[in-house]
Amino acid sequence: TEYADKWDCIIVDECHRAVTPGIKREIERFFGNSLWYGFTGTPRFAENPYPQMGDLPRTTQELYGDCLHKYTIQNAIHDNAVLGFQVEHNGPKNKKDETDSNLYVTESHMLKVLEVILNKSYYKLGFQNGKGKTYEGLLTTSSIQLAQKYYDLLKMVKEGKTTLKIDEKIKQVLPDFPKFAITYSVTENEEGSHVNQQKMQESLDDYNKMFGTKYEISQIQGYNGNLNKRLARKDAKYKSRNEQLDLVIVVDRLLTGFDAPCLSTIFIDRPPMGPHDLIQAFSRTNRIYDKNKVYGQIVTFQAPKLFKEGVDNAVRLYSAGSTQTALLADWKEVESAFRKSLKALRVSAETPEEVPGMSIKEKKIFVKLFQDFDKFFAQLKSFTQYEDNMLAGYGITEDEYTDYAGQYLNAKEKIKEDTDGQIDDPGVPVVDEDYELMAYSHTKIDYEYIINLIQNIVSPDEESQDVTQEQKQKQMDEVKQYVEELRKDNPKVAEIMTTLIGEIEQDVNKYKGQSILNIVENMKQECIEKVVTDFCITWYTSKDDVMYAAMHYRNGEIPNESAIKETANFTSYKEVQERAIPKFKYYTMMIAELRKTLDEEIKPLMNH
């Protein structure tokens, strides 16, 4: 009461929902003199007001006064604070009445939706990133009953009991896909609350089995909290594929205020929502995450015409009247741009084999054109209607793209090395040196990902400390599986990790609290030291010089070849060799052997 008669400043975050008009009026009556400041990304305008309730205010302006400052979606995208949206509108076309709900409740329709989610979202869900680094999706429906029906249908699909089969391309990356869950308020529908609770307990049982938890219906808040953390993946524990989800089915939960940067896509199988609800739902997908997540993905499955109108209106409303920045081009526009960029690329280099013979100026033009082509190719791949077999019709193959990509990377290196060409030429495009290929599929196992998994075994976070012995063994088996996959590309680093894992299995506390990354890097350095020492003993060369060569070896070039030859001791070499080679052959053979050692023994330990 001591504040009631004073001037009070009240600041409200998420003011579109945090304080209702009725509650605000009650607070104002208590605090006789108050100044209110509201922050919101989705204010209520005259176009989307609060429901009429007597004489209560219906817009954010009526509640808080004139807007003091605007920071729109366009501003945030321009500042690289969030991503733009790629929106696809699916569903029955050319229907007179798109609002006929009977079109969307059949199992046939639902299987078509699941076909898109399970088999047509390879790039939307980040399968090109590889196991453990894929993204997540939300599927939102208009009712709890439909959400439950989708959950049951997904279980049937996974058990092979429907006509819908998961593509081998998907299963090669994630054999256990999809890992899914469901969440809704068990009191949302009082009439069906008993059924909802029973169905939710069945879902909890599935969740418990999947992740080793023990949630009952009475612990629904604990379950929701755990689900939120699992989706957000901000704790080290959830970096492991064993602890991840691919899809969560919701009605309204998680559509506002939930922050999960690794969530890339929202699949909407419900009628068009209002502008405020659309933007809130869309905004779950456009958080900055990694270099391959370049926009938030939205896929709708009902009333395509009405949905497009609704989305365009909502984005205009919250982007100061424009959709240009926030919404990416549709399939037709992207496909046209892709064809044009491919044509331009072919003019620059009809085949990848032409690139090495180009001048630096020509290489710069090629690099810029390939960056444009790669950008449109990545956008094309992200649409659900994209099929790999379409490439033949465009006049290029995935293998040819990979060859172009290889030449592109080599050309970038040559441009960097060209010290004579640093002066800008007005006739040559500026090369974006920081550009990273977007359409390139690289499903190799990531070195740092395995390091993080091992780190969580030896130094678990708080949530991971109570796991059972069975779960610990499951974690270790997962790490071993990844190491074996790494062995295909880098057997030397894989062998070091295998040694480390063996030591951890013998004594899990041996490296507790220590940095696994530092330990592995030290083990790699020890291997490099041994290889260098053995080479120097054999050829009587300077260890410092050979070590320098090992640390700076690039593209087959030994940077200090002359110095190594100068300090090499042929006399000592000859004394210990029973059948020593002539001096004129010694230097040539020694450098050839060094290059082979660097390529086969050192380089794999320097690369991950």
Regions found by a protein language model. Give the residues of each.
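Generic recognition of flexible, low-complexity loop/linker segments
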Residues: T1, G22-E26, T72-I73, K120-Q128, ...
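A compositional/structural signature marking long, glycine- and acidic/polar-rich segments
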Residues: T1-E2, A349
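Signature of the SF2 helicase/ATPase Hel1-core->accessory helical subdomain module
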Residues: E2-D100, M110-L111, L255-R316, A320
